[in-house]
Amino acid sequence: MQKRRKNRLLLFKNGEVKMRKVIKIFIIFTIGFNCIACNPKHNDYSISVIDTSSTTNKSQITFYDNNLIKKSIYKYNYAELGTHSYQPQYKNSNIYLVPRGIGNKHDEKKIISINKKTRQVHEIYVNKNNIQCVSVSKRYLYTSSNLNMISYLTQYDMKNKKYHDLSLNDQYLSLVFSTNKYVYCFVNSLNKEFIYSTLQIYDHNLQPIKNIDITTIGNCQRKYTIYKNKAYIPVSYDMNDQNISKLIILNLKTNIIENIISFENTSYIGEIVKYKKYLLISHTNEVSLNKAKFTIFNLNNNKFKTINSNICIKSMAIKNNSLYTVDSLNYIYKFDLLNDMKLVKKIKHTPPKNMYLSTIAS
């Protein structure tokens, strides 16, 4: 058990042993791309499916319309673009993704934003290896990265084109998200007996505001959603590294954890998406599909209903009144949210040779 905990927490040791000294500035520039069957109208697609490679700088994004008919394909020169472990981030008409880079190097050192109207890409250079996730608020962009037992919270001021770093020694920064007032960091560290977990809250000067011990709640937070000044964060493992299925409800005005919801007899939470006053939750089980479940959670009263799904959901996205999901076999499903989640259509998506499907976005 101890070895498994240590292996999972030490994943962020990937990358170069010694980082080159690089001038710590952010550079934004436009990158060219190739398009097959282009039709760059913003309203011609419902979801985008991202395929990528771990061994070469190749990725492609396939755009499907609301009937799951392929509209266009755009190719980009990135390795490990996107992941189903973290959600794509959205701001205005842009999707923000992490291209981690080839193999164990993970040295791409950048965030990309893709304009949903033009499909053009802008790169935001970040002087860090092994970037895990990105968060975007009104003015600031934040990334978490991990290297050689040190985690870094990196801030980019999109107005003044400046950056600020905060290092966390012997800690693993699993999730960062931000509002216009605060930055929220979920951090894990390993002691001799269990995984110690905290929620560290900072202002935008990266000055500490509050530190909440969440060890007894659990760890491995990777996703979140915000609804009416509250954040909803899934918890996948307990302090002893056992799978659990919990949901933290955090008040973003008071910075107090208001509630912890437990989902009994379910696998860990794989995906969450917000639809109107509901949170749609997939409980993933790659081993046994009959244990895969789906929860419809009412955000106004915390009541929920869990049903069997028989689909190992890998990624989810909402567009208009439809839910799109991708399973572990790369089948794309469209469900009608106005008709009791009726299955409307199912198609097979085939990634190019030597690529894999990393995630979907709306």
PLM segments and residue spans:
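Blade-level signature of beta-propeller repeat domains, shared across WD40, Kelch, NHL, RCC1
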Residues: S328-Y333, L338-S362
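Repeated scaffold domains used in trafficking and secretory/extracellular systems
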Residues: E80-K91, K128-K138, D170-N180, T216-Y227, ...
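Acidic, serine/threonine- and glycine-rich low-complexity intrinsically disordered segments
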Residues: D170-Y275, L279, H283-V287
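Structural motif
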Residues: T55-F63, N104-I112, M149-T154, K192-Q200, ...
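Post-signal peptide N-terminal segment of secreted/secretory-pathway proteins
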Residues: L68-V136
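Residue position within the beta-strands of beta-propeller blades
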Residues: V49, L97-V98, T143, C185, ...
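An edge-strand/N-cap motif at the start of beta-rich repeat modules
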Residues: C38-Y76
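A short beta-strand motif characteristic of beta-propeller blades
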Residues: I69-A79, R119-V126, K161-L168, Q207-I214, ...
